[in-house]
Amino acid sequence: MKPTEEKIHADPSDLPIYLFKQGNNCEAYRYFGAHIETRAGESGVVFRVWAPHATAISVVGDFNSWKPGSHPMRKVDNDSVWELFIPGMKEYDVYKYCVTTRAGDLVYKADPYAFHAETRPSNGSKVYDLSGFAWHDEAWQEAQKKTDVINGPMNIYEMHAGSWKTKGENVPYNYSELADQLIPYIKEMGYTHVELLPVMEYPFDGSWGYQVTGYFAPTSRYGTPKDFMAFVDKLHEAGIGVIMDWVPAHFPKDQFGLYNFDGEPCYEDPNPKRGEHKEWGTMVFDFGRSEVQSFLISSALYWLEQYHIDGLRVDAVASMLYLDYNRKQGEWEPNKDGGKENLEAVAFLRKLNNTILGRHPHKYMIAEESTAWPMVTKPASDGGLGFNFKWNMGWMNDMLSYMKTDPLFRAGNHNKVTFSFFYAFSENFVLPISHDEVVHGKGSLINKMPGDYEAKFANLRTFFGYMMAHPGKKLLFMGQEFGQFTEWSEEKQLDWMLLGYDKHTELQTYVKTLNAFYKEHPAFWQIDYSWEGFQWIVPDDFQQSVVAFLRKDAAGKQILVVCNFNPVLREGYTLGAPVSGTYKEVLNSDDEAFGGSGTVHNKSVRTHKKPLHGFEQSITITLPPMSTLYFEVPTKRTRKAADKAETAEKTTAKKTAAKAEKPAKAEKAPKKTTRTTKAKAAAAAEEAPGKAEKAKKAAKPKKAPAKAKAEAEAPAEKPKRTRKPKAEAAPAAEAAPEKPARKPRAKKAAEPKASEK
């Protein structure tokens, strides 16, 4: 139900207030906050705020020399909602609420519903009129309504607005200027979406935006609200989607913010065992309180509707779901059923997703949820949380752990490559290589890779190729696409000077090529969440650290993916082939253009009639050391029954002509027979055991008998170390900064989210 925008009267049954107190005013920002309007022919601003425990509230600012009590508000519902109209106030005027607590103290608070705010270190709210912006993204909006959200391409470039690129000495671009710089780069690189770290107003740069004080105000660090509208509008016109991080899990204790808003808990849970994250130093919302539900759901819809944002990535969902999250014994209380689940938070998330996706089914609601909580991306009506995507933190942790391992020891960790297929299709996953993985001593992505300078690039290329082919949508944090060696810092721009070195430009070219290949081949995104879009060929060659699998699209087109996670050349590597014909190599991470050796290319490979891996035929290829290869699978041709009958008739006619000189014999009518081909029989045999069993074997490799192994694949070679680095690029491989950037408080591994504290 959409709240009205009619003139509000001092009546407790007023619709906006009634819906607000029921938890159902999902456009509360239209009523609360500061709004320019005309009363009795005089222009001014009406202020409204919710403060249930206050004994008095006044509006203060430059207009009254910040004098408490000079402009007192009055209750409009005889309960908790306060209002005041001040003639003569105008856009950009700064104000706060001076709240008198029940203890008699005065606290000065920023407006929770403010559309604009002062730039830190100042923290006052500003009057702002959102109306009047001319949008130009109608074509984008209409196209999005027809988009298949789940079965479409999604390749996200995650970025921090203030440190992607700066002008001058670390002076950030404003939102509109940033769009002009960003659009050509995103289009050239081929990403489909940009995801912004939080841009809701926040006081501390080192929190990266994850400690929010203004849930309705784009941070003024980068301009005005209309500047941010221009940012989104320009990206949409360029065909680029915009996702933003949204933080409903917790908020900071800054005295001007939501904390103890009227001297007592309003927005936070009043129970100290539920209302505070001591390790993070932040407060937890009271998810069961109706007014808080209206506040948060209004905030989410505000960004989607007023700023045309395409989706929200909901931060720290795991911390909302569990009462014992980051709490020791005695620091938490069980729920009414004796469990550790936060029942109110679960109900809130379901309500949030039902509301948003009910209004906008084409929007993205992405959960950053790091536990095994079931059915995160299933509808609330089926017992799920109602998101339509979830970050795959398990895949990320396993694969980064595997890639850090020296290739000599990867054989014993092969299950980390294959284990994700135990659960890959249980949720609608996004594969995230996010900002959290390149900060606080974890090292940049390329510095996680083992080996010398060239080996690091070869490992990273192999990993990117595997990631792009793995089922699930994709996300990569800025700077990793060209191999930044230093950890990310919010205090300075990316190390763009690295693109003056060949290895970095070649890696960037490789990522650009991968992104283009991804968009052009539906097999990589059309069936991401079903076994119908994926099939193992070689899951368990742990001794040689090789995997091979198929990705398929809805039309039956297939891409064969082969990954060699060892720096060893594999000549004569044989694997099963689903279709007979010629297999064309369409991407090779070891290509010279990408910084590889360029010594091995399979170009086109013919199948031979050697059954293997459950298929009637196989191919033999050469695997470059430390590489990912993509092959185009030939289209399977199926002749129609009529064609077969015609061929049979021609064959019979030839035989008859050849025997013409012999006495004619009575010819029997040809018998129609239907035989199951060997290929069909083999396929049936393979299907019988079930795909889940195949995934199980993949995740837990077993040693194959020596005879079978020799027949199936090329003999294993002892891994060799790669060549020593070239001296030319040594300056690019700079170490992480000696002086670490400011950072939020440390956090336990349960939710790998360093930035939330």
Residue ranges and their predicted role:
Residues 51-53, 77, 88, 160-165, ...:
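Short, flexible loop/turn elements at secondary-structure junctions
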Residues 1-152, 176-186, 454-457, 468-476, ...:
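Carbohydrate-interacting/catalytic domains
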Residues 74, 205-209, 253-260, 377-378, ...:
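Short glycine-biased active-site loop of nucleotidyltransferases that positions the nucleotide triphosphate
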Residues 183, 232, 300-304, 353, ...:
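Non-transmembrane alpha-helical segments in soluble domains
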Residues 118, 138-151, 160-341:
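Substrate-binding/active-site clefts of carbohydrate-active enzymes
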Residues 636-757:
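Intrinsically disordered, polybasic Lys/Arg-rich low-complexity tracts
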Residues 308-310, 325-491, 498, 519-590, ...:
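Conserved alpha/beta catalytic core and glycan-binding cleft of carbohydrate-active enzymes
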